[in-house]
């Protein structure tokens, strides 16, 4: 059984609200950079950056973060140091206010890995987390600073975020396992 809990309009409103909250919390967009976690976090990050451009008339740098080498749930060769494979980060995070964007916050492990990757890129002034969906069930003490929608769910359920750039539609669904 599949239940749509966020449609395209609700997703658009949530991202717009997150954008306003980012501006308010940071008192503007000075020294702000946005990093989207691959895959869907990248597209959400670009949408937030686009809204920031519209609202503040400033282009905020956006990058794509691949955290695969930093994940603790994948078997890695213990002899090799993780290497940031940030395919699309052409700016420094040193001293910047980083907005880390992902589609779903669940256990917190993806975010922990992303923070490790960011620290390998440099020492940011701060890191704030923006997620479209917070579903609970944390295994690590991580919380989002900006949340589009809280969707309590059981661990047997799956939250699926679809974005039009790769899925041909915008939606958030709960799927029964």
From Swiss-Prot:
GO terms for molecular function: RNA binding; uracil phosphoribosyltransferase activity. Keywords: Glycosyltransferase, RNA-binding, Transcription, Transcription regulation, Transcription termination, Transferase. SUPFAM superfamilies: PRTase-like. It holds the Pfam family Pribosyltran. InterPro entries: PRibTrfase_dom, PRTase-like, PyrR, PyrR_bifunctional. It comes from the Bacteria. Its EC number is 2.4.2.9. Homodimer and homohexamer; in equilibrium. Belongs to the purine/pyrimidine phosphoribosyltransferase family. PyrR subfamily. This is Bifunctional protein PyrR. It comes from Levilactobacillus brevis (strain ATCC 367 / BCRC 12310 / CIP 105137 / JCM 1170 / LMG 11437 / NCIMB 947 / NCTC 947) (Lactobacillus brevis).
